[in-house]
């Protein structure tokens, strides 16, 4: 019989996908899931997690989610995870008295970063994928239904890069990378031609930004984000240095 103290916990977290060997626990001891499970198991919290979304190798996340059943306080668990795992940050949680299937979300938001300002042609090509379509030709074949709905596509434009935001309840394997790859290489109607995954965009610019649930509000966990700030500052300086290199070459 389960303890009365046993609670159901959703944890929202992010990770730098380039630092891990894929996501799924079966792929490697250094996969995202494996690293989390190893720490939770070491501290006798749990030996299993249920993930809301699986990302491709080298794809990062800012708001993925996993579920565990536990008797420990959420703050203690997030403190353990943040203190023992590099290149991940565990920032929010939701506690419930009953089971929550983490995959039953209402919306996922992905961001794809393009390192330049895109023109209207590329925007139009990407916008063609809005709505409900059969994405068989824009995904890696697996057992899942290839019909998916993209509810919204937004473009965030900055001085020297563009962020494409995709909103949808669920996506199939390689779908968004295939969309970006096709849109960059072809002006044809993507659903009127025979095409299969010929142009797969790079995984590193893709980020699972957030997963949203109906009637669930995550509680923010206060943690020391000095590592993230320091990493950002060092990478920002490095990017400026290489920008100077490029300008000196172009002169």
Curated annotation (Swiss-Prot):
Give start-end ranges for the coiled-coil region(s).
none
Name any Gene Ontology BP term. Answer: tRNA pseudouridine synthesis
* Swiss-Prot/TrEMBL keywords: Isomerase, tRNA processing
What EC number(s) does this enzyme carry?
A: 5.4.99.12
Q: What is its biological role?
A: Formation of pseudouridine at positions 38, 39 and 40 in the anticodon stem and loop of transfer RNAs.
Cite the HAMAP family for this sequence.
TruA (MF_00171)
- Would you tell me the protein name for this molecule? tRNA pseudouridine synthase A
Question: Which species is the source of this protein?
Answer: Picrophilus torridus (strain ATCC 700027 / DSM 9790 / JCM 10055 / NBRC 100828 / KAW 2/3)
